[in-house]
Design a protein with these regions (language model features):
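TOPRIM fold recognition
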Residues: 64-65, 77-167
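TOPRIM metal-binding catalytic domain and adjacent DNA-binding surface shared by DnaG-type primases
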Residues: 1-24, 163-167
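Broad hydrophobic/π-residue packing in well-ordered secondary structure
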Residues: 1-5, 49, 112, 144-147
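Phosphate-handling DNA/RNA-contact segment within nucleic-acid enzymes
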Residues: 19-108
Length: 167
């Protein structure tokens, strides 16, 4: 249900049934080693396994291109799908939180931050602290997945490609 609500119908490969509910399991790695996972319930609630490492943890979706950092898994799927439609290469790092983006960015060559346009301004603040080029929805409260659902993959892709040209 969660991925369907985010515009990805039929994406069931990481779904586990548990106590009558469907849970999306997103692996988290540090240096290629599995350190835990993020569990996303049907209603979108998210949690990590008790006691697991989250610092520097990421999920990398690699297509041998520019490094792109984002917070969430659905956001990464929107970025991946939009850039694939534009025939662009990418290496997307799902960082699971804005604060963790700073840790993941260390040691990577410059790339593009896909910042959430949080009401609090956290996404943009962290993007500026990292110092890379960044893309952010022009609508407060939106992330790239929300933009994908509002304007479609083509418009999202064109906007992302314009930002990538600045990297």
């Amino acid at each position: 249900e969660y991925l369907n609500s985010k515009g990805f119908e039929g994406a069931e490969d990481k779904i586990w049934g548990h106590e009558g509910r469907k849970i999306l399991v997103v692996p988290m790695r540090v240096g290629g080693s599995l350190v835990g996972c993020q569990l996303i319930d049907e209603d979108g609630s998210k949690k990590f396994l008790y006691g697991q490492r989250t610092s520097n943890a990421e999920l990398v979706i690699d297509n041998k291109g520019v490094h792109i950092l984002c917070e969430g898994y659905a956001t990464a799927l929107s970025i991946q799908t939009a850039l694939r439609k534009m025939s662009r290469r990418y290496t997307i790092h799902v960082c699971f939180s804005a604060g963790n983006m700073k840790k993941v960015a260390q040691g990577l060559p410059d790339g593009l931050i896909i910042a959430d346009n949080d009401q609090s301004g956290t996404g943009e603040r962290v993007a500026k602290e990292i110092g890379w080029q960044y893309w952010m929805s022009d609508v407060v409260g939106e992330d790239a997945n929300d933009t994908h659902q509002r304007v479609g993959l083509l418009k999202l892709g064109l906007s992302l490609v314009a930002s990538l040209k600045l990297v």
